[in-house]
Each structure stands twice: as C-alpha cells, then as structure tokens.
Amino acid sequence: MRTFFRNDVAPGVATGIRWDGTTNEGKPARNGVYSFTISAQGSAVAARRATAATPATLSFSLYGYAFPILGAHEFDLGAGRFGAPRAGHTHQGQDTMAACGTPLVAARGGTVQYAGYEAAAGNYIVIDGKGTPDDFMYAHMAEPSPLQTGETVRTGQPIGVVGDTGDAEGCHLHFEMWGPPGWYQGGSPFDPLPYLEKWDKYS
C-alpha cells in the first residue's frame, strides 16, 4: 500500500500524482491489479458526506516490464533465434519482425548506458534495468534514439522506432538481455524469448 497526501488541491484545478511503482518502504511493488482510492479529510468535507458516502475507487494493472514493440510483430524462430549459428559465432539476441517505423519502448526503465551507431547493430541503445542486474539492448533502429547516455528512462517510455540499419535483413528489432556485470562488461547474454513472450501477453 502507498499513501499520498496533497494539500494544494482546488475546485476546477486538475491535480495529478505519479506513483513510481514502489511501496511505502521503497521496495518494488509486485505485478498485479491495484486499486486507488480518492478521499478527502477535514471539517469542510463533513458537510458533503451525504453526496459522497464512499470514496471513488478505480483499478489498474501494474507490471514491471513492457513488451518493446508497439505494433504488429512476429518472432523470428529461425535464424533470428538466440543461439542460432552465425559466421564464426552464435546469435546473441532475439529478432522480432515488425514494420519499419513501428514505435519501440523501454522493456524496463533504468539508465541509458550506451546509445550510438555500430556497423553490425546499426542504431542501438543499451539500458540497464532499474532494480535488476540485467542490461537490455535494442538494435537496428531506423534512426538514432532521442535518448542520450546517462539519461533516466521509464518502463514503457519511447526509445526509437523499428528499422533495418546496420547488418540487418528486413525491418526488425534485435533485442538482447545481458546478466551482470553488464553488456560487454564481462556479463553474458541469455535467451530473451521467454521474457518477450511473457511481456507480450499483457502489453
């Protein structure tokens, strides 16, 4: 449970509260359905009890991850699979086909570790997952990401669009997940498909 108090509300003025997905103790909240209650306190409210007998309650779903492609897509289960043989090495990510220009969002919020262009990856960005030991890499974007190294990113925040830059055959997202200590910092890539399939079900 998380409680917020606002003392600056006024009639006819829109007021917002942003929840960062943590509990009152500062720990990440679990995935699931949450409800929020709007209530008022004070003597001026007592006179309104007859018309507002119960607080307004709404619900929403909270998930710590988001599927990175906002549009029609198809997993490449052939040469685009993690571990598929390549010239002298194996494929280190999962390719997901989507039309060029399809929006991409951060699967997990965090801090941008790298953002740039590389001959094989094309336009790419690497984000370290806040509250996780993992790094998330997105490659072949049509244009450079609008985000810069060191910027903070929210889960689900736009990071670019699908493209075919670099060594890419057709429009798709090449997505990698790396364990600690991170992407090309001594960590190792692992198969992201089970995670992508899970996120795809609720995103």
Regions found by a protein language model. Give the residues of each.
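Surface-exposed, glycine-biased beta-strand/turn segments
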Residues: 35, 39, 44-45, 52-123, ...
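Solvent-exposed coil/turn segments that connect beta secondary-structure elements
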Residues: 41, 101, 130-132, 180-181
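Zn2+-dependent peptidoglycan hydrolase active-site motif and core
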Residues: 106-145, 149, 171-179
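Short hydrophobic alpha-helix segments
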Residues: 4-7, 116, 162
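Short loop/turn motifs at secondary-structure boundaries
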Residues: 1-60
